[in-house]
Each structure stands twice: as structure tokens, then as C-alpha cells.
Regions:
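Surface loops and adjacent helix of pleckstrin homology
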Residues: 109, 210
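Basic, often amphipathic N-terminal segments
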Residues: 1-100, 113, 117-196, 212-230
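Low-complexity, intrinsically disordered Gly/Pro/Thr-rich segments
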Residues: 192, 201-209
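Generic recognition of long tandem-repeat/solenoid scaffolds
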Residues: 8, 104-108
Length: 230
């Protein structure tokens, strides 16, 4: 399959979280096919509230989607990711439900500097594979009133919300109307209750691609090469 853009995700592929999240969002990035969504509170149209994040699947972004630079190939990007992952150590964290700028996500229960350091390393070391942002992409990003630092990141690194502005999160909804926020919060907590507050171990990264269907598909999952501190 040919892809329009690529990204580096954390995807808990062998975990209950992935099964729950794929069912919640309605898309399975590993199988590359729709996932059946369960019915929840009758006041909520789950298909509607998950429409925006659905195509990305259950994930946390480590390096945001980018076009492939001229002169490099997907296989070269995959090899470099594998080499990079050999130097990475597993990271422990737990999750809770949070509201971020009007949408809901799963976020770490405590600030995790190790995840931020991993993000920084991945963004920098794989940047040679990223094509510069197009004029249309720059216009689109700048509609969000970027700070000077964010605009500089956009120009230099292709994405504004990195490094100090990076925030590890697993998106579960689009923007939710105020009158539904409490109900949506309750439903998310109920649905994901089996995995909330549990310890997760990030021990692999995924290379994903955006197909011409607009959905993201897993190209490869790459395990970390270093042992956990424990």
C-alpha cells in the first residue's frame, strides 16, 4: 500500500487498552479495518463524537504525521526506526481521563520526563526523512494562533507542538459540547475502567502510514532494545 504521510505512534498492540480503544474509536490500525463500536449511553452518539480521531486509531503520537522527503524510502525509514529503538528503554506510566481543549483523552497520571525525552529523540533523529511542510500546511497550522516558539518549530521541524509543548495523550473524542461533557466523561471512565490507573510499559513504537482512504495503518511495530530498569 502506498501512503500519503507517515507518523511514529505508541500503540499498546498486545494490551486490553488497544482492544477497548479500537472498539471505542471504530478503527483498527493494526488490521487496517473498521472495528465494531459498542452502544453506550443513549444520549451520546459514539460514532459522531469519535469521528475526528477515528482515522488515526488508538494511539499516542510521538512524531506527528509528515510527508516523506525526496530521495528516501519507507524501507529506509523503517530501518532507521528499528536502529533508534535499539537504544530505547521501556517506560512505565499509568493513565487517567482528561479534558484537553474541549476533547477527551487518556493522559499520564503524573508528569513523565522519560516520555518527553523519548519524544525529543525520535523527532530529532528521524527528521531527515520528513519533507518540509507545504504552504497549505503552514497556513492551516497558523490559524491556531501559534506562539513564536511554536511557529519556529513548525518551520524547522514541521509541527508546532513538540519539545516543551509536547503532551503525551491518547485521543478518544473530537470536541464535545458543554452540555454533554459530564456524560461523556462518565461513559469514558466506565468503558476504560479496566485499564485506568494500571501500570503500562511502553516497550515498542509503531511506524504508521496514512492510506489514500484517509485512515492510518500500522506498517511495523518495533520493540525497544534496552532492558527495563527493574
Amino acid at each position: 500500500m502506498n501512503f500519503k504521510r507517515y507518523a511514529i505512534y505508541y500503540i499498546p498492540s498486545n494490551d486490553l487498552l488497544y482492544k477497548l480503544g479500537s472498539s471505542w474509536l471504530g478503527w483498527d490500525t493494526i488490521l487496517g479495518q473498521p472495528a465494531s463500536q459498542l452502544e453506550i449511553n443513549s444520549d451520546i452518539n459514539i460514532e459522531k463524537i469519535t469521528e475526528t480521531p477515528r482515522k488515526y486509531g488508538l494511539h499516542a503520537t510521538i512524531k506527528a504525521p509528515f510527508g516523506l522527503a525526496d530521495g528516501v524510502s519507507t524501507s529506509e525509514l523503517e530501518r532507521q526506526l528499528r536502529t533508534l529503538c535499539l537504544s530505547l528503554k521501556p517506560i512505565e506510566f499509568s493513565l487517567e481521563v482528561s479534558e484537553l481543549n474541549g476533547f477527551f483523552a487518556l493522559t499520564p497520571t503524573v508528569k513523565n520526563t522519560e516520555i518527553r525525552e523519548l519524544h525529543t529523540k525520535v523527532v530529532c533523529e528521524l527528521d531527515e526523512f520528513r519533507a518540509p511542510p507545504t504552504k497549505d500546511e503552514l497556513i492551516k497550522r497558523r490559524r491556531n494562533q501559534l506562539t513564536s516558539e511554536q511557529d519556529q518549530n513548525l518551520i524547522k521541524w514541521g509541527y508546532p507542538y513538540i519539545f516543551r509543548d509536547f503532551y503525551f495523550h491518547i485521543t478518544l473524542t473530537g470536541k464535545i459540547p458543554k452540555n454533554l461533557k459530564n456524560t461523556v466523561t462518565d461513559e469514558i471512565k466506565k468503558f476504560f475502567e479496566p485499564v485506568l490507573q494500571r501500570i503500562f510499559l511502553m516497550s515498542e513504537l509503531a511506524l504508521v502510514g496514512e492510506g489514500h482512504d484517509g485512515n492510518f495503518h500500522v506498517i511495523c511495530q518495533t520493540p525497544f532494545g534496552q532492558k527495563s530498569k527493574k
